[in-house]
Regions:
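A positively charged, amphipathic N-terminal helix/segment that binds anionic biomolecules
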Residues: 17
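Conserved NAD+-utilizing ADP-ribose enzyme module
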Residues: 1-14, 22-128
């Protein structure tokens, strides 16, 4: 059980989400970055987190960028619900619930903006 109560997140607030460099192409997130895992898409409520804190919670923080999404805009996407789901060690944890078909994932790509740029994926050098 969590020690933090679930709260109602205002439409005017923002969410942060880590995006691993494998889910980027040409500096932009690809639709596959926006998918449910364990029932929802894990994000963090900006009221209780910063972009740096969000990034630091990744397995290898340096492999991730962080995007920002406006809660009201996320709620305006088809069948998407924003629910504060705090965890014992992360009061900011928030799930975005709802099916994320290709159309919805493309819309997530359009509504997000980088607050921490992703690292460039190293390119393989050709041997001569």
């Amino acid at each position: 059980m969590t020690v933090w109560p679930a709260e109602t997140i205002p439409h005017t607030d923002d969410l942060y989400m880590r995006v691993h460099r494998q889910w980027t192409r040409d500096g932009a997130p690809v639709p596959g970055a926006f998918q449910n895992r364990d029932g929802g898409m894990s994000t963090e409520w900006a009221h209780y987190s910063t972009p740096d804190e969000t990034r630091s919670r990744g397995r290898v923080p340096a492999d991730n960028g962080v995007v920002k999404m406006h809660v009201g805009t996320v709620r305006g996407l088809p069948n998407q619900t924003v629910v504060h789901t705090p965890e014992k060690t992360n009061r900011a944890h928030t799930d975005v619930l709802g099916e994320k078909d290709e159309e919805v994932r493309l819309k997530f790509c359009r509504i997000c903006s980088w607050v921490i740029d992703p690292p460039r994926t190293p390119t393989k050098r050709s041997s001569k």
